[in-house]
Amino acid sequence: MNTLRIYIVGVGGQGNVLASKMIGEAALSMGVPVLMSETHGMAQRGGVVESTVVLGGAQSPTISDNCADILLAFEPMEAVRALSKANADTIVITNTAPVVPFIPGGSAAYPPVDELLACLRAKVGRVIAFDARKESLEAGNPLGLNMVMLGALYGAADMPLTKESQMEAIRKNGKPAFVESNLN
């Protein structure tokens, strides 16, 4: 099996770590070798969270610059910040709904999302951008952004995982109250 390197970025509270865990669990259930790591920013909602999932015969979960096969971004600014991990062949899947950082005593200037997407498109050949927050709200699960992003990943990339293994990982790791909406 070829190695598949998935770099996942977002901000605290978006479910990045749980999403990476679900990919890893699905891989393990199928006997696919998997290595994972995560880096947390601030210990509160809004800090940067990075996860890596490497499927296949790799020796390390570290994804070097220009080596990600997939960049899965739960927040558009974080997609741009992680662009060093991408190359021309990387698939970028990004949520377009920004999480504007909290700045005590002031407000933050957030660049237009169209400008962020243009930065992504200038480096990689394939960018899939959509409002995952809106999709999760329409599905009746306001906390389901991570599941929407996983669905986009599974639909857009050639993953070595079966639908059954992915669904079982959701059942095993998801909150019982949201399992059904996460599976749909």
Segments the model singles out, each with a brief description of its role:
Residues 1-184:
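Active-site cofactor/cluster-binding pocket
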